[in-house]
């Protein structure tokens, strides 16, 4: 069984015996235990289990103890370290020198012992050696006997741990391409060097004929298929057919296509993660899957011109339930856009919640909305908004029908209630696909995302000569008056899922206006997650050495390794680019 990645906690100490070290042992080890307790009681893995920490076998005062800690961590699948100390220690003798995992150091802010002095010294050693480390230093002085972790320190410890765990969860997994390049979209030109060097992932690929092979040869669970078909008939609403009359399929053909798309879902899932049931049926090779943490399906146009499209498959893979009940979502990209798939993956690993995949389709200015609908925008919509709409698929969690404290939310699967599942299904229908675009048919997903949800839109882009760059836009979903929504929505495809999004403006740069956000967006797709997680994304990007070219995160929330400040403190964007370029990818 594959172990969860763990956080290693390193209590470092003044190595002087005969009084000094002995007086600090209990306080130092208690710091380590309190950090481990904070992380394990607050953070969860994507499967809902508490995050595991490993504490060094002893306090670390000299090199042999640092080496013993390193050996333990290697055996324990430690993906990142947090060093803690209340006192002076010997900097380069006690530091962890692993170059391929993130490091953080918390130096206790107290007057009795110089924990802050050690913090500064060891961070200088990290900078000298080219091994980045995050520095954590509480704003307020604490008493030596105080065992509480200050709130500002907690925030940084948890931000670091969330991002560090994401690096560990990605390592040694795969991106699975189902098909190849869709309609010339750059993001679906999969770059294996990026996956290997920045994420520690490998790439796998299957031709889309693998779907028809498995259907024709019965390489799926027939019992599950019958159960799935019954569930779909009882729970999934077929929507209005918007096709012109000569393109409307017969009832018999639509029924056949429902069976087809259910099989597509089962096969897509089995390709990603395997299915032991297939081995029982005699298909041992297919049963193991591809160890894929994220995948994408090309679809257009070679598949969709002939077969039912992938919308149903993509929708339910990204959703946290199906006929087998509530479960964690898969991360699955439309049009095999691997870069949007990775954007979704970053969001998912930081939040444990499902992701909206959408076209960043239209900027609606207040003037244009007024001209088309007669409505004057106000509130969060006053400066205009973006129409986020995918061409037929989206996680049903994106409806916003789950709630917390009476407000719409996208929540982890272990919090999801059966009543919320039913609400998502009731507020979604599945119209026959637009056969002018999808000649082979299929069924799209249609819903409207509820308003007033805090969300973050993210996109990873590849820039020749630079490499990957990340852009982030925090904002809110909107609920427009019903007639306004219908007027605007019907100008695109009324059979597709819509989210109205207003980014938070800052008055400068790419966030001077909503138009500027649209104009500076790097690609046609975006990954949208619940919550304002821009600060976590910036921390994760710095660990992977991916510069951020556009964000609206308050400066006081930005948390990067300490040596980033040595590249400049006034122009943080420029310093980020220089640091990432000099240090290079995490796994190179």
UniProtKB/Swiss-Prot annotation:
* Active-site residues annotated for this sequence: 335, 359
What's the superkingdom here?
Answer: Bacteria
**Name this polypeptide is given:** L-fucose isomerase
Q: Name one GO cellular component term.
A: cytoplasm
Instruction: Return the EC number.
Output: 5.3.1.25
Xref: PANTHER family: L-FUCOSE ISOMERASE (PTHR37840:SF1)
Q: Which cofactor does it need?
A: Mn(2+)
The protein's annotated catalytic reaction(s) are: L-fucose = L-fuculose
Q: What class of enzyme is it?
A: isomerase
Copy the pathway line from the protein's UniProt record.
Carbohydrate degradation; L-fucose degradation; L-lactaldehyde and glycerone phosphate from L-fucose: step 1/3
Q: Which Gene3D superfamilies match?
A: 3.40.50.1070, L-fucose Isomerase, Chain A, domain 2, L-fucose/L-arabinose isomerase, C-terminal
Give a single Pfam family match.
Answer: Fucose_iso_C
**GO terms assigned for molecular function:** arabinose isomerase activity; L-fucose isomerase activity; manganese ion binding
Q: Which InterPro entries match?
A: Fuc/Ara_isomerase_C, Fuc_iso_dom3_sf, Fuc_isomerase_C, Fucose_iso_dom1_sf, Fucose_iso_N1, Fucose_isomerase, Fucose_isomerase_dom2_sf, Fucose_isomerase_N/cen_sf
Residues that bind Mn(2+), according to the entry? Answer: 335, 359, 525
User: What is the annotated role of this protein in its UniProt record?
Assistant: Converts the aldose L-fucose into the corresponding ketose L-fuculose.
Which of UniProt's keywords are assigned here? Answer: Carbohydrate metabolism, Cytoplasm, Fucose metabolism, Isomerase, Manganese, Metal-binding
Task: Mention one GO biological process in which this protein takes part, according to its record.
Answer: L-fucose catabolic process
Q: Where in the cell is it found?
A: Cytoplasm
In which family does this protein belong, per the annotation? Belongs to the L-fucose isomerase family.
